[in-house]
Amino acid sequence: MMQTRAHSLRHQTGLTLVELMVALAIGSFLIIGAIQIYNQSRQAFVVNESIARVQETAQFAMDTIETDLRMASNWGRNSRGLAVEGRSLVGDANPTGLTVPAPTCGDTWAFDLGRPIDGSDNAYNLACGASGGAAGNSDVITVRRASVQPVAPELGRLQIQSTRIQGELFETDTIPAAFLPVTNNPITGVPSSGTHNLMVNSYYVSPTSTLIPGVPTLRRKTLTVRNGVPVIEDQEVAPGVESIQLQLGIDVDQDNTVDRYVNPGDDVYNPAADDYIPGVRVMTARIWLVVRGVTTEFGLRDARTYQPGNVNMGQMNDSFRRLQVSKTILLRNART
């Protein structure tokens, strides 16, 4: 009986030191592996989140500009800007004496309906100041059009009254006499003319955002009304946009095909310029955007060379993530 008990006690002495060390080593390896997997997953999440933010910014900025461009030269009931009375003429920026929106971006900025798409090449050429300055490697894109939905006449707002063949700019709360009386088509019920708000937007890049100081941003000068007076507001559109570039596809022989691409502000489509080509039409718009993240990324070095449009931005050699996108947009109203 005593021998059995002594034998049992000798076999209940616990783990040896070697066994304990092996167990601790295995546990340590498992913990280290779990931490590495966590860190890698966290790093992948941060990278994916950064990529998604840059892509979202690029998509939003492109969609905003594209929406305007696709509706350029829409004047309500027709798409012929040269048929709108009150538009800027060669030598007469404001023939009917309409109120020039303040702060003025130029005498023809709001009224040059003969050029529904315009701009400047790698320079800020508007008379109104750029909020926070303007980036030197970026174009200015100006789009003129009318609102899609008809509205009621509004005192102080620049509007267009139009039919299928003519139009007129006005700013009173009364429809111009040339379009009275407004009658409805007996079959379709459509009024003989419609009132639409004049819309003018000039997109540009500022080197610093008001929302996120130090970050470049896409901004626009937009025509609106305040206290019964037409004014120009400066709005921030998308922080993170470093450059916008525009080229216009023009048709010079009236065959509804693009013959060549020119930079914004080119004289070939400016009726007041010596190199103007009579009958030229802008058929397409090609847009480039360079978008960057709003914060730096650890371990990232951007060594790519960016060449949007006709500008070479070179290598940035910093820790911001960037994306360059481009799109060619058909201008539907140029064909009608």
Predicted regions and their residues:
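A generic, residue-level signal for flexible/boundary positions that often mark functional hotspots
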Residues: 45-48, 231, 323
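Flexible, small/polar- and glycine-enriched "cap/hinge" segments at structural transition points
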Residues: 331-332
